[in-house]
Amino acid sequence: MGDIWTWLISFFFLIALVGIIVYQLVCLADLEFDYINPYDSASRINSVVLPEFIVQGVLCVFYLLTGHWFMTLLCLPYLYYNFHLYSKRQHLVDVTEIFNLLNWEKKKRLFKLAYIVLNLFLTIFWMIYSALDDYED
């Protein structure tokens, strides 16, 4: 029964990450179609970057503490990428450069979204597997 709770908690962490990344993509799309000015778009995106990094870090530590080594190893590249961006001070969107880097910023977030959705599908699979395994016992 404990594994189901572990997968359920990680499911909600991943849903939060998907929501944050989709919010960033919507802000970039609004900027692309001129619904929002660059300053507002950059401030909205920058306000959720650190929570995204924190949620991802907590999720990776959560997998480590619960003994799910495969999922921990699967989360490490994304965590390393976030740490690399943060240490080089490239994690925030610059207001003056946002139009020049718009396609790159969208592409980065689409790759992040695909990576998180893959983790989400694996989490759903293991949650269902754990529920069926507990049902058989």
UniProtKB/Swiss-Prot annotation:
Q: Which GO terms describe its biological process?
A: vesicle-mediated transport
**What does the similarity note say?**
Belongs to the cornichon family.
Keyword Secreted, does the record have it? no
InterPro entries, alphabetically? Cornichon
- Give Gene Ontology CC terms: membrane
Q: Which residues cross the membrane?
A: 8-28, 53-73, 113-133
On the tree of life, the source organism's domain of life is Eukaryota
* UniProt entry tagged with the keyword Iron: no
One Pfam family, short name please?
Cornichon
Its predominant location is: membrane
What keyword terms does UniProt attach to this protein? Membrane, Transmembrane, Transmembrane helix
Protein name as catalogued? Protein cornichon homolog 4
What membrane topology does this protein have? Multi-pass membrane protein
Report the locations given in the UniProt record.
Membrane
* Species of provenance: Arabidopsis thaliana
